[in-house]
Amino acid sequence: MEAVLRWITAGESHGPALVAILEGMVAGVEVTSEDISAQLARRRLGYGRGARMKFEADKVTMVGGVRHGRTMGGPVAIEVANSEWPKWTTVMSADPVDPAELADLARNAPLTRPRPGHADYSGMLKYNFDDARNVLERASARETAARVAAGTVARNFLRQALGVEVVSHVVAIGTAANTTGVVPTAADLATVDESPVRAFDAAAEAAMIAEIEAAKKDGDTLGGVVEVIVEGLPVGLGSFTSGENRLDSRLAAALMGIQAIKGVEVGDGFETARRRGSQAHDEMRPGPDGVLRSTNRAGGLEGGMTNGEPLRVRAAMKPISTVPRALATVDMTTGEEAVAIHQRSDVCAVPAAGVVAEAMVALVVAQAALEKFGGDSLTETVDNITSYVKRISTRPHVPADSRPQ
């Protein structure tokens, strides 16, 4: 099945700008440049970020698809300018440059020592590059700014069509973890963002900061785990009919597509695999407004479909591969032992990864909602949602006095 909502990004880390194009969004969704800028500012948050975050401005320009603060039904194009572009106009020029002009530029020195864990090595071989610059410019996590921009339109759609919010928090950084099991709601998002590490527990926050400081002192980097939650989704987004239509498989693909993400779990995920069946599933009982669940171990997804419980998905981020204490590698020009190149980088970008994960979850859930409910305008989509919710609420599992009139 061809996706109703599609997105693509373009641009390099030190190019003039990043561009996001979102195709298939209904008309009438309220979104502004300020909305996108606010989400990009959240992406720059986090203890352990590098120097680039201090001057990255992320100037947003809505290039197409939006007029007077509302989508028009056509592709939405968003440009996010790179504030460092003036320093790179020659080195990253799209047009040919005189080699003599490039020869004396330190920024243009070939990068021939690939970083273990990065795209450098495989990218150089696959695309026949002698310079890793051609790989790392696109492989850089700077590209996620464009995804956050597109995700802002999707999260605004979800809020306006379904009344739901997408939130995230950091569960672990290195060995420091939040073990309380308490999950933030939409009302807690501001509190989470106020935490330097976007943790929803004061004790965990202190431990995470200490972990980052220790890694920084040792010239090292850290990874961690983020969790994304979406409350209030109706039953039935996604499908059991094929693997590609299962919402959990689509969420996993979207999250694994984020730079440095190495694992995804839905609900209790791998912990569920260690339980017996009687302790692994969410038992059901009649309630005043329909079915109630005693737990949410499934993370709001059963059989590839939302089940009415909060959607809960986690992503594991590996430590950043640009390690200040450079790792051993091979020089691709000489074939000799070498130490890996070092580009300016973060000690830890896990807090920012949570914001990027929110954007990807918003895009996938919005895609599933548009596939289910259709419509060319927000008004039409909302009418379709209302009709669907009313229909499933007339089933016997909902008491008669709680059914929509």
Swiss-Prot record:
It catalyses: 5-O-(1-carboxyvinyl)-3-phosphoshikimate = chorismate + phosphate. Residues 275-286 have a biased composition (Basic and acidic residues). InterPro entries: Chorismate_synth, Chorismate_synth_AroC_sf, Chorismate_synthase_CS. NADP(+) binds at R43, R49. Its EC number is 4.2.3.5. Keywords: Amino-acid biosynthesis, Aromatic amino acid biosynthesis, FAD, Flavoprotein, FMN, Lyase, NADP. GO terms for cellular component: cytosol. Gene3D superfamilies: Chorismate synthase AroC (3.60.150.10). FMN binds at R138, A139, S140, Q259, A260, G303, K318, P319, I320, S321, T322, R344. GO terms for biological process: amino acid biosynthetic process; aromatic amino acid family biosynthetic process; chorismate biosynthetic process. Residues 275-308 are annotated as: Disordered. Reduced FMN (FMNH(2)). Its cofactor is FMNH2. It is an enzyme of class 4 (lyase). This reaction introduces a second double bond into the aromatic ring system. Belongs to the chorismate synthase family. NCBIfam families: aroC (TIGR00033), PRK05382.1 (NF003793). Homotetramer. PANTHER family: CHORISMATE SYNTHASE. This is Chorismate synthase. It comes from Nocardia farcinica (strain IFM 10152). The lineage of its organism: Bacteria, Bacillati, Actinomycetota, Actinomycetes, Mycobacteriales. The gene is aroC.
